[in-house]
A protein has these predicted regions:
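Predominantly the structural core of cysteine protease catalytic domains
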Residues: 114, 139-265, 270-276
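A short, polar/charged loop/turn motif at coil->beta-strand junctions and beta-hairpin connectors
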Residues: 80-84, 127, 210
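Alpha-helix initiation and N-capping motif
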Residues: 4-5, 85, 126-130, 147-148, ...
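Acidic helix-start/capping segments at beta-turn-to-alpha-helix junctions
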Residues: 124-139, 170-173
Length: 276
């Protein structure tokens, strides 16, 4: 059904692309420097374990600045009684992987965000299809897509169930037929907006406590997902090398003041991070 809640997007860094899951076990070594540069130029990077990540295209490298979208959230009343921790993960569909296609926007929005919204409203787990939006946008290209394109489809058409239009990382060409599109109309969003950026941390915490998940487009480097000194897969901005970055869409589903961190759900499978 159409959600009366508005989807809010916190776009940390403008991008038209996204990363794919790690697919091999190569290792960063000094002797392979020339190969690494070639891989980076083609849109890849590796984590400390040698897992290779692919991106769907170019992004605004070197800019960690927040970029506000066309429609901005206004007049949000920031809660003065925010809990120390809050987590919407219980409403998520099963953690899954986008595979080797640049479909992170559709995974974050169509699969995680919209499935979560419907699950909160209906009281049971719903599994919607990232392929419904991704295939319509990519049209067989299988590269990265913009957040706004995905959100516009959810606003205009909705999104179908996984059963009606299953996802395969070997197919970004097949298009939903009219029957599938008709079923998708039950799962629309009413609107989406950007955060103002003026008090973003508390804006995000307030929205999460109102059961409103937040889309982000994040600038990442090789440190993303690496365990920190506490054993957590936390991402510390001060450690980011903005000369070697990639861009990726994810969904913010919680926060923890004890760790001074927000919790995101990713589309690289349960092996990544803290079980996904």
């Amino acid at each position: 059904m159409v959600r009366k809640l508005i989807l809010f997007t916190a776009v940390i860094s403008f991008f038209q692309a996204c990363n794919d899951e790690p697919v091999d076990n190569s290792v960063f070594v000094e002797e392979q420097e020339e190969q690494e540069i070639e891989e980076w130029d083609s849109g890849t990077f590796k984590d400390k374990d040698g897992n290779l990540f692919f991106t769907g295209g170019d992004c605004d490298q070197g800019s960690p600045d927040y970029i506000v979208g066309e429609f901005v959230l206004e007049d949000l009343q920031i809660s003065t009684t925010l809990p120390i921790q809050f987590d919407l993960s219980e409403f998520l569909p099963p953690i899954d992987s986008q595979g080797t296609m640049g479909s992170c926007s559709s995974w974050a929005i169509s699969y995680y965000m919209k499935s979560m919204q419907e699950g909160i409203e209906d009281g049971f787990t719903t599994r919607l299809s990232p392929a419904y939006t991704y295939n319509q946008i990519s049209q067989g290209f299988c590269g990265g897509t913009a957040l706004e394109e995905t959100l516009d489809i959810l606003k205009e058409q909705g999104v179908s169930s996984w059963i009606d239009f299953p996802y395969s990382d070997a197919d970004c060409t097949t298009q939903p037929n009219e029957t599938v599109k008709e079923s998708a109309s039950d799962n629309k969003i009413s609107d989406y907006k950007s955060l103002s950026g003026e008090n973003m941390v508390n804006e995000m915490k307030t929205l999460l406590t109102q059961q409103i998940p937040i889309m982000i487009g994040a600038t990442l480097s090789e440190q993303f997902g690496r365990p920190d000194s506490f054993g957590d897969a936390a991402y510390r901005e001060h450690a980011v090398n903005y000369e070697r970055t990639a861009c990726h869409a994810m969904l913010v589903v919680g926060y923890d003041n004890l760790h001074n961190a927000f919790k995101v759900v990713n589309s690289w499978g349960v092996e990544w991070g803290n079980a996904g």
